[in-house]
């Protein structure tokens, strides 16, 4: 590799906020199932603290050796609804507390997998887990929860959609920030390294390391050099930049998995913003030529960005997976925050944008008096986009008590802050209360 390319990468790290967003170890807990929940929890704690004992140490060694910042070290586990169902317990909070203790013991930032997969229907463990979510998130600091309510092959479980709206409101009453650790999915993936939606799928190996890259600032800087050029040039520039960013993820992921003695899973090609200036997906879209994100043309610009990132990234690594697209969280992106404050970026526009990117209505703060049925309807809309387009979509929405449009909420850290966004006042309750299942689309019949 020539010196110029090496210096380009050094400059990306020093001046353009390039980092690896996460190294995430996925751990199967299927061999921890036990009819005695205390024994099961002890097995879970022992396995996590053994397998992930050196995860943080190795990540820090690689940061020092390669000079590449690794923002987060995380763990995902098998969905707990599958593990805890054998116990017959009436709630699964103790499993969440065990995950939290294990995460703290090994020093990771977050642990995901307090999850249930109910896209076609409930099993007993799913019902118990979902009812346990509010208390589990109340009693833990690092645990993340997710529920998959639909898929292209199965349709949408509207009973689960209704219940998740109610769970979001229950979380709001305890602590609205807890909803930042809860994601409701359609077409959830098994190898997602990002939080709060990560879990370790049953088709994965016993232990695997997945990597999530970042780098919106790098893409924006590259586009500043092609002002006024055609969209062909813009797309090519994004592809070349994504290649460099992903190559770094592949290098670190392979080396980390080798040192940890685990399988190397995937690199997730998602562009993940932070609230820091110069680390914004919205600013990339504005660099392409929009006066503000949220105006007409936003969806087209985002579609091209997302596709070009995938095309560049696929060439750079052996296994691509996870969510692999541009994230558009309202609270974690300085450009999104600015556009929302001005009223240019709306929930409706964000919904349109999710049709062409990862992942969905993410970290959206809404008025505290928003009804549970309205939250459920937002979930249903997102799930429908995912189901019809055969892609992953999700909702992470945060109703804030006592707040209304014009106010804002401070989350702190990577979550940033969010202006309260208006939602439609017209009720969707009669539709949500029907329950049942929305059938899978006709083009899902592939066999």
UniProtKB/Swiss-Prot annotation:
Signal peptide: none
CDD domains associated with the record: RNR_PFL_like_DUF711 (cd08025)
SUPFAM superfamilies: PFL-like glycyl radical enzymes
Cited InterPro entries: UPF0210 (IPR007841)
Family: Belongs to the UPF0210 family.
Assembly, per entry: Homodimer.
Protein name, UniProt field: UPF0210 protein Ldb1026
Organism annotation: Lactobacillus delbrueckii subsp. bulgaricus (strain ATCC 11842 / DSM 20081 / BCRC 10696 / JCM 1002 / NBRC 13953 / NCIMB 11778 / NCTC 12712 / WDCM 00102 / Lb 14)
């Amino acid at each position: 590799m020539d010196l110029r390319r090496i210096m380009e990468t050094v400059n990306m790290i020093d001046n353009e906020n390039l980092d690896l967003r996460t190294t995430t170890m996925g751990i199967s807990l299927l061999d921890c199932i036990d009819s005695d929940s205390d024994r099961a929890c002890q097995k879970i704690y022992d396995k996590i603290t053994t397998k992930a004992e050196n995860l943080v140490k190795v990540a820090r060694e690689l940061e020092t050796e390669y000079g590449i910042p690794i923002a987060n070290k995380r763990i995902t586990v098998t969905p707990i609804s599958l593990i805890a169902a054998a116990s017959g317990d009436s709630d699964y909070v103790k499993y969440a507390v065990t995950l939290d203790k294990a995460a703290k013991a090994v020093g990771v930032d977050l642990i995901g997998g307090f999850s249930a997969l109910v896209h076609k229907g409930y099993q007993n463990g799913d019902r118990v887990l979902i009812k346990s979510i509010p208390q589990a998130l109340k009693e833990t600091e690092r645990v993340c929860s997710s529920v998959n309510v639909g898929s292209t092959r199965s349709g949408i479980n509207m009973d689960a959609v209704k219940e998740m709206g109610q769970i979001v409101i229950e979380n709001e009453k305890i602590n609205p920030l807890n909803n930042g650790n809860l994601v409701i999915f359609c077409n959830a993936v098994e190898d997602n390294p990002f939080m709060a939606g990560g879990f370790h799928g049953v088709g994965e190996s016993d232990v695997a390391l997945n990597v999530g890259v970042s780098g919106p600032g790098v893409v924006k800087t590259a586009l500043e050099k092609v002002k006024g050029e055609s969209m062909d040039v813009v797309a090519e520039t994004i592809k070349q930049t994504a290649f460099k960013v992903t190559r770094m993820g592949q290098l670190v992921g392979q080396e980390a998995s080798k040192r940890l003695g685990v399988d190397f899973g995937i690199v997730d090609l998602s562009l993940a913003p932070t609230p820091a200036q110069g680390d914004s997906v919205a600013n990339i879209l504005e660099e392409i030529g929009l006066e503000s994100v949220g105006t007409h043309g936003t969806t087209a610009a985002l579609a091209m960005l997302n596709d070009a990132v995938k095309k560049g990234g696929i060439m750079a690594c052996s296994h691509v997976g996870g969510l692999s697209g541009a994230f558009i969280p309202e609270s974690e992106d300085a450009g999104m925050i600015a556009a929302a404050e001005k009223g240019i970026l709306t929930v409706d526009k964000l919904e349109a944008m999710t049709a062409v990117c990862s992942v969905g209505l993410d970290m959206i703060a809404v008025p505290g008096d928003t009804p549970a049925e309205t939250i459920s309807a937002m979930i249903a809309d997102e799930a429908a986009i995912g189901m019809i387009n055969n892609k992953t979509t999700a909702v992470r929405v945060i109703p804030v008590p006592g707040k209304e449009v014009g106010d804002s909420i401070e989350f702190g850290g990577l979550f940033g802050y969010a202006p309260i966004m208006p939602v439609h006042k017209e009720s969707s309750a009669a539709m949500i209360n029907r329950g049942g299942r929305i059938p899978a689309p006709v083009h899902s019949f592939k066999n």
